[in-house]
Amino acid sequence: MNAAKKKRPAVRKTFHHGDLRKALLEAGIALAREGGPNAVVLREATRRAGVAPNAAYRHFSSRSDLLQAVRAAALSSLARAIEAEIARVRRSKLPADSARATLRAVGTGYLKFALEETGLFRTAFSVPDRVEGDVDLAKAGKSGLNPFQLLSAALDRMAETGALPSERRPGAEYLAWSAVHGLAFLIIEGPLSRASQKEIRAVSDRLLHMVEKGL
């Protein structure tokens, strides 16, 4: 065999302590982006980072540990996507109208992320987790709020401005969330998976309007 064609041994990289964890996490995020939660495998993450498999255990003792870290990063990315939509909201002279627009922006950001970053979206919700009272900043966006907290804040503002009756505020997160989350999966892998972009925009707009009016 020609020496030039011989497979060269993998080059092992050296990292400072924190840098290796970051490299492994970035590799895990890339895997999730490509194939969802099932693609997040510790051995493959170490291969992509260019280190021996045993090196990972100082930072992630198991695949589950890596998946939890990747999941937190995915939730943070989702929060940032929602924040970006909120930032685009044009403030109205009427506080209630601004509150409604903000709630719609939360739903719009959620759906956009689900469709544009499907692997990360699946990963974000791959493990059952408590959302109320979660103070893990690894799951938060630039505002320091995670996706659930951003939704809660939007609903609080709806109630404060009279756009949402105060007696209907408790638990409203789960009503709005279940509707938008359900639509996301109908588009990702359900009967709407073959819908055109125009059709998806139309049904998304109708659903967000329904959520706003139905709460």
PLM features per residue range, with description:
Residues F113, R157-M158, W177-A195, V211-L215:
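Amphipathic C-terminal alpha-helical segment
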Residues E83-L120, A176:
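Hydrophobic alpha-helical connector segments
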Residues L20-I29, A45, V70-L78, I82, ...:
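Generic hydrophobic, amphipathic alpha-helix propensity
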Residues A23, A27, L31-D65, A69:
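Helix-turn-helix
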